[in-house]
Amino acid sequence: MVWRTLGASNFSTCPNGSVQWIWDVFGECAQDGWDEASVGLGLVSILCFAASTFPQYIKACKTGNMDQALSLWFLLGWIGGDSCNLIGSFLADQLPLQTYTAVYYVLADLMMLTLYFHYKFKKRPSPLSAPINSVLLFILGTVCITPLLSSTDPVAVPREGFRGRTLLSVEPGNKPFTKKEVIGFVIGSASSLLYLLSRLPQIRTNFIRQSTQGISYSLFALVMLGNTLYGLSVLLKNPEVGQSEGSYLLHHLPWLVGSLGVLLLDTIISIQFLVYRSHETAAASEREPLLPS
């Protein structure tokens, strides 16, 4: 594995030692149980984010109304946030594993966007427009990402701490922000803002439709779980040597806001699922014919 060759050179910089495989794979200096728990939660959060879109793919194929159920601005905001993470993974010299994970998230978002336009164009008169435009959209996104992926340089670089879906990070320490840190902080803030703003159009769409039909709740449930675990993984990690807790939280503030802050909006969407589904169940029971006496 490419990222495995990057860990041996600076293992001595870990003051109290580290779990070897955690250092080899992530370059993370896991000094105690808190750091190990942080890495474990981060890994589970990645699995949650990676699996979150599959239920929506299945739901879209079953219902065929994804273009009505999901807000386009929700999808664009989501892919915008993940794209910022992808850009930041290159600017901040992230590990190849983290970069490939960021690429996967963007490709998963492109697949969601492809399904959206597939069902939107499918309603047009030309029967060929839907598959052609969907395939072209996915190919275009893949072509745009492939040069970035192929340009990943496997030369050893300063190692960042382990991250979940939000891959951007900055150097530890109490010193003022460097230019590189400022760029990462700005991109991370933009990413968090896009994640937050993306929920508002979806909440509005659900409210206007008074329905959540066509949306898989597993999409939001897994994202909520992933964001919770990621936020906890950041909070559980020990600050670096010589770094205060306040400095650590300040350096990671945008990503904490992007993960834990969005939970409030996802909770609102969860409430919409409960309310509108109860209405739909009641309406369906009213439409059932009365049994003959």
From Swiss-Prot:
Q: Which residues lie on this side of the membrane: Cytoplasmic?
A: 59-71, 118-127, 204-214, 276-293
Q: Which InterPro entries match?
A: LAAT-1, PQ-loop_rpt
> Which regions span the lipid bilayer?
38-58, 72-92, 97-117, 128-148, 183-203, 215-235, 255-275
UniProt KW NAD keyword: no
Q: Provide the tissue specificity.
A: Ubiquitously expressed.
Major site of localization recorded for this protein: membrane
Which residues are noted as glycosylation sites?
A: 10, 16
Q: Where is the PQ-loop domain positioned along the sequence?
A: 34-100, 191-243
Q: Where is the motif Di-leucine motif annotated in this sequence?
A: 290-291
Keywords in alphabetical order, please: Amino-acid transport, Glycoprotein, Lysosome, Membrane, Repeat, Transmembrane, Transmembrane helix, Transport
Choose one Gene Ontology CC annotation of this protein and give it: organelle membrane
Annotated GO molecular function terms are:
basic amino acid transmembrane transporter activity; L-arginine transmembrane transporter activity; L-histidine transmembrane transporter activity; L-lysine transmembrane transporter activity
Where does the record place it?
A: Lysosome membrane
What topology in the membrane does the UniProt record assign? Multi-pass membrane protein
User: Topology: which residues are Lumenal?
Assistant: 1-37, 93-96, 149-182, 236-254
**Any coiled-coil regions, as ranges:** none
Q: Which GO terms describe its biological process?
A: intracellular amino acid homeostasis; L-arginine transmembrane transport; lysine transport
Under PANTHER family, the record lists: LYSOSOMAL AMINO ACID TRANSPORTER 1 HOMOLOG, SEVEN TRANSMEMBRANE PROTEIN 1-RELATED
Task: Please describe what this protein does.
Answer: Amino acid transporter that specifically mediates the pH-dependent export of the cationic amino acids arginine, histidine and lysine from lysosomes.
What family classification does the UniProt entry report for this protein?
Belongs to the laat-1 family.
What protein does this entry describe? Answer: Lysosomal amino acid transporter 1 homolog
